[in-house]
């Protein structure tokens, strides 16, 4: 399929889970894809290249400004431009009472999940402005950006912050032809969630019971929403937080 033919997209957090599924979907739709992760996704990019797609891997710490700037530049140096970005990189911390949180844990989560989104948007937008072209950016929040859960204060704060960044920046760039939106995934089958199913089984069991559709989501189900938000089919969608959660947050 060629819905994204001649387009260039950055996908962060592309080593696995939703990020990898999104990178694979964009590649299959004809885009040239920069797979970005703190742990460089060399094999994941090579698998796409071996399948006949256009891809590169880039090691990047999204919480570090120079690393993010270099990542965007390498993408442009390789593919000649930038059209879209899915800022997906994020980390989780163990369930912890707010007063028991360590400062370094708070800082780590906020630096990756919120500051990282800001830095990625900053350099992606600078590149789109330099090109003078339209484009689209999708940021990964979470159902944790819409609700609260006891023991998840810093993670949920970081994901609420993503929505604030998304909505405000979307207003800044709507008139410039650059659309910015967010996805809010629910409980997705990813390595991070699979680990939580083991380490926090009681809490996850209770959460699963509250999902109306009665199952975990597949990473590909989120990827398809990201693809749609970047496509011309979503040309009038700006500053929105799209839940992909099996009905969890409408209860």
Regions flagged by a language model, labelled:
Residues 121, 158, 166:
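Active-site helix of classical SDR
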Residues 142:
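Residue(s) in the substrate-gating loop at a strand-loop-helix junction
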Residues 96-98, 102-108, 207:
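Substrate-binding pocket helix/loop in short-chain dehydrogenase/reductase
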Residues 15-16:
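Conserved glycine-rich cofactor-binding loop
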Residues 92-95, 147, 227, 238-251:
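Short C-terminal tail/terminal secondary-structure segment
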Residues 29-43:
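Conserved glycine-rich Rossmann-like NAD(P)H-binding loop of the short-chain dehydrogenase/reductase
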Residues 174, 179, 237-239:
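Short, small/polar-rich loop/turn modules that mediate ligand/substrate recognition or access, typified
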């Amino acid at each position: 399929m060629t819905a994204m033919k001649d387009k260039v997209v950055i996908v962060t957090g592309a080593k696995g889970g939703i990020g990898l599924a999104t990178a694979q979907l964009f590649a299959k739709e004809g885009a040239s894809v920069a797979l970005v992760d703190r742990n460089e996704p060399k094999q994941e990019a090579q698998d796409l290249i071996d399948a006949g797609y256009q891809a590169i891997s880039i090691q990047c710490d999204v919480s570090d400004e120079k690393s993010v700037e270099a990542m965007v530049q390498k993408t442009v140096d390789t593919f000649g431009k930038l059209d879209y970005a899915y800022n997906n990189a994020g980390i989780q911390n163990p369930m912890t009472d707010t007063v028991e949180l360590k400062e370094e844990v708070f800082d780590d989560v906020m630096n990756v999940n919120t500051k990282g989104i800001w830095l990625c948007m900053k350099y992606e937008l600078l590149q789109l402005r330099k090109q003078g072209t339209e484009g689209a950016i999708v940021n990964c929040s979470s159902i944790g950006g819409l609700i609260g859960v006891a023991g998840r204060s810093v993670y949920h704060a970081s994901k609420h912050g993503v929505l604030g960044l998304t909505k405000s920046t979307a207003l800044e760039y709507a008139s410039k032809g650059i659309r910015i939106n967010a996805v809010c995934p629910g409980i997705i089958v990813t390595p991070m969630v699979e680990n939580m199913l083991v380490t926090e089984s009681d809490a996850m069991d209770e959460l699963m019971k509250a999902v109306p559709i009665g199952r975990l989501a597949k990473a590909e189900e989120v990827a398809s929403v990201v693809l749609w938000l970047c496509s011309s089919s979503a040309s009038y969608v700006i500053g929105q937080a799209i839940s992909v959660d099996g009905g969890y947050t409408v209860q």
